[in-house]
Amino acid sequence: MQIDKTAELNLLWGTLILEELSRLGVQHVCMAPGSRSTPLTLAAAKQSKLKQHLHFDERGLGFMALGLAKTSHAPVAIITTSGTAVANLYPAIIEAWLTQVPLVVLSGDRPPELIDCGANQAIIQPALFAQYAKQINLPTPDIAIRPEALLTMLDEAISNQSLPVHINCMFREPLYPSTMSADFTQYLSTLGNWQHTTSPFNQYGKTSQHSLPTQDSLARFVHGKGVIIAGTLSPQESPEILVELSQKLGWPLLTDAQSQLRQHSGVIGNVDQLLHQPKARALLAQAESVLVFGGRLLSKRLINFLSEQKWKRYWQVLPQQMRLDPSHSAKQVWHSSVAAFASQAWPRSSDANWALQLIQFNDGLETLFQQQIDNAEFGEAMVVRAIAKAQNRQSQLFIGNSLPVRLYDMYAPITPDYPRTYTNRGASGIDGLLATACGVAKHEGKATTLLIGDISQLHDLNSLAIARTIESPFVIVILNNDGGNIFNLLPVPDEKLRSDYYRLAHGLEFGYGAAMFGLAYNRVDDFESFNEAYQEAIAFQGPSVIEVSVAQHQASEQIASIATWVKQS
């Protein structure tokens, strides 16, 4: 290949890569500007089957892709240039790996002769993500390498993949073709019918990893008193079928904030607080069997209950082989979808309805929350409950880490309608939460609310640039308690240490940040103002910011007060 055709061959390889990704189910491509990734960028720009999303910051870009992949339930491509641009994706890649979300990183790179020799913007990119991504290292485009070798490498790496893949793409200059005069007809002729179809070059059948118990095993398992626990489940996993299973067995269904069922009227959603209550805890202690769907439970009290209880039978259902049990309990792990496992011919338990009193206890807590939160002083828990009540089956709720997700888990109301719920609880970081929520909002354009703390929002402030591109209702509710006030709940030995080294009060407001990016903004410090601002924002076709100003100790003091009431109830 003559040197003046290098740019055209680079672009051809980029085109083959992006075309095959679209055939492998990729619907979205997220791109940051950069020169070394030009062959990929130009190919993506002309690829009509991929929806393009652009952002200048690769860290936010990676998290936006994560949100898109969560909601589309399909792999999302990310294009970056070389150097630290790629490294900025690392937090999002870690979160994706831990939560089994497929991302495909396409990183532009210098050719081998420019690595480790002082060349500009060149780092060692292969294996940059260590164990957190499957690694594919492509050679520089070469006419001697048949195009089907490139396609089959992509097909094997991405088909049936639920984890991140890093495809490192080395390109020699020139990168910008002035013309497309090179004739690659003969080079592409070995692809045969691929050029006239819409299918991947190699097609892999779906891998079935279902392992299901026998009818005899089911009968033995349901003998006695048991509970069902719904951990982290996606909306696509049809978790509602667990309500039917609970009713069929006559066992209570205890739900985590991330189960999609936390607000459902047919479940025991207040389990975190019920485990504070002596009567409820004593009743739950009678359970002999437990059936856990998913993992990554939020409530420490529920995790401790699972760990401390002497189970006769402990089953956990996961979509594939992995360890999701920090207590390391002895158990039978089944690999199955939620729907396949729950829809078996389950017999009714010999001790059906053994824990009906839990419904009373659960409803009693809801009454207590109405008194102690909804009709008390304005604060974070009141806002969380109000937002939860305002959702419906068509809306999406992204809940930020630290205090917001814990308030939702502890106090979310029982409602006839409830949203699709999303979190980033793999590594549980406070980075990239706004960007991930933007990705969630962008896929289908459903009304989306983000509940986020002030420190988390400061951490991801420049992702307001992504938010401004959203054309559907997208409400960013910032709970501003002036610092990391979740540390008020932790046993830091000295109040000055807590203030100086953990809480980090900043005294900042977000009005100028919203104005910088041209976003509608309201700052509220009472419920009437919040409710009015939220109703206006959720009806607006675009992004809005609502800053909720609350005192530093309001939430922690209220949590302690409610815990006292619960223990006495």
From Swiss-Prot:
<protein>
    <recommendedName>
        <fullName>2-succinyl-5-enolpyruvyl-6-hydroxy-3-cyclohexene-1-carboxylate synthase</fullName>
        <ecNumber>2.2.1.9</ecNumber>
    </recommendedName>
</protein>
<dbReference type="InterPro" id="IPR004433">
    <property type="entry name" value="MenaQ_synth_MenD"/>
</dbReference>
<dbReference type="Pfam" id="PF02776">
    <property type="entry name" value="TPP_enzyme_N"/>
</dbReference>
<dbReference type="InterPro" id="IPR011766">
    <property type="entry name" value="TPP_enzyme_TPP-bd"/>
</dbReference>
<keyword id="KW-0464">Manganese</keyword>
<comment type="similarity">
    <text>Belongs to the TPP enzyme family. MenD subfamily.</text>
</comment>
<keyword id="KW-0479">Metal-binding</keyword>
<dbReference type="GO" id="GO:0000287">
    <property type="term" value="F:magnesium ion binding"/>
</dbReference>
<dbReference type="GO" id="GO:0030976">
    <property type="term" value="F:thiamine pyrophosphate binding"/>
</dbReference>
<dbReference type="InterPro" id="IPR012001">
    <property type="entry name" value="Thiamin_PyroP_enz_TPP-bd_dom"/>
</dbReference>
<comment type="pathway">
    <text>Quinol/quinone metabolism; 1,4-dihydroxy-2-naphthoate biosynthesis; 1,4-dihydroxy-2-naphthoate from chorismate: step 2/7.</text>
</comment>
<dbReference type="Pfam" id="PF16582">
    <property type="entry name" value="TPP_enzyme_M_2"/>
</dbReference>
<keyword id="KW-0808">Transferase</keyword>
<dbReference type="Pfam" id="PF02775">
    <property type="entry name" value="TPP_enzyme_C"/>
</dbReference>
<dbReference type="GO" id="GO:0009234">
    <property type="term" value="P:menaquinone biosynthetic process"/>
</dbReference>
<keyword id="KW-0786">Thiamine pyrophosphate</keyword>
<comment type="pathway">
    <text>Quinol/quinone metabolism; menaquinone biosynthesis.</text>
</comment>
<dbReference type="GO" id="GO:0070204">
    <property type="term" value="F:2-succinyl-5-enolpyruvyl-6-hydroxy-3-cyclohexene-1-carboxylic-acid synthase activity"/>
</dbReference>
<comment type="function">
    <text>Catalyzes the thiamine diphosphate-dependent decarboxylation of 2-oxoglutarate and the subsequent addition of the resulting succinic semialdehyde-thiamine pyrophosphate anion to isochorismate to yield 2-succinyl-5-enolpyruvyl-6-hydroxy-3-cyclohexene-1-carboxylate (SEPHCHC).</text>
</comment>
<keyword id="KW-0474">Menaquinone biosynthesis</keyword>
<keyword id="KW-0460">Magnesium</keyword>
<dbReference type="InterPro" id="IPR029061">
    <property type="entry name" value="THDP-binding"/>
</dbReference>
<comment type="subunit">
    <text>Homodimer.</text>
</comment>
<dbReference type="InterPro" id="IPR032264">
    <property type="entry name" value="MenD_middle"/>
</dbReference>
<dbReference type="GO" id="GO:0030145">
    <property type="term" value="F:manganese ion binding"/>
</dbReference>
